[in-house]
Amino acid sequence: MIGPDGCGFDMRSPSEMEADDARRESYEAAHAPRMAVTSRIRRVVQPEGGYLPLFLFDEVCLADPVPLFAFEDVPADVTGLAVDYLSRVARGVPARDAFRVPLAGARLVGRSADAERLLAMVDGFSDRSVRAACLLCGFDAASRRGPARWRAGRVIDPGPATVYNVRRMVARTLRFMDRVGPVVWEGFTFDGGYTDRVTSGDGDLLTADGLWDLKVSRWPPNPTYTLQLLVYWRLGLHSTHPEYLRVRHLGLYNARSDTMWSVPVARIGADAVRAVERDVIGYADGL
């Protein structure tokens, strides 16, 4: 910086420099990228193995004897959303509530009429209902990532193999929920816990003492998945919702492999929690 004397040195007093640093930090915090949990964690460089390594988890395979088809003709994220939302409908959640995120996305891109037509077809687990659910989930990205990230035609009308797989994975998910339930909150949020770095996000399900995320990946959980769980838990504890105070373990369930992974929160290191709260979520003091 060029000082008042025109030389290449900062001639301000220490107090002036400290005040300027404080203003700059305040500005950077206010203008830092704002994003959902899933977007934020993709940008995080984690230590080797991740903040929450998979070896800390206990793995249980539920071993559904009925196999899935190897090929699906819609994007993997859409398959996962369809399984999630249809599982909620199967448990009695009104379809409009279960599909609220893609419905909001459709409004953002001026396709509400199309979305409403598809929603009217979601009436159970018929082929027509599952196809409509997949097409409706195509609008989800417009809501979660912004209209600019939505692309018309990305999701095609799914074929028989995809419809069968979605239906079977919904059945597996319902069986899993019966095993770990009772489910006390589906689509949980973190009101009061969001920060300038994590401004939105919602999870899959809370049981009486567990926080679970649902996946349909073809691969084992990676550090991004486990970090997502850790971020959800800490956001929840900083939120206004007392349900998170009862969480004693975090878990992932993959309906494609019919496998669950869970870790007691007491097994998670304090240093990892502190780093995630401070560096990932943006809480000033951690813990």
What is the predicted role of each segment?
Residues A113-P182:
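A non-catalytic, helix-rich entry segment at domain boundaries
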Residues G203-R218:
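Conserved catalytic cores of phosphodiester-cleaving nucleases, focusing on short active-site segments
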Residues G251-L287:
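Domain-level recognition of nuclease-like catalytic cores that cleave nucleotide substrates
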Residues R218-P220, S257-D258:
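Short Gly/Pro-enriched loop/turn and capping motifs at secondary-structure junctions
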Residues L227-L250:
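Metal-dependent nuclease catalytic cores in nucleic-acid-processing enzymes
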Residues L68-P75, R179-L206:
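Active-site metal-binding core of divalent-cation-utilizing nuclease and nuclease-like domains
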Residues W219-Q228:
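Active-site-adjacent loop/helix micro-motif of nuclease/hydrolase catalytic cores
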Residues M1-D123:
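N-terminal, charged low-complexity regulatory/assembly segments
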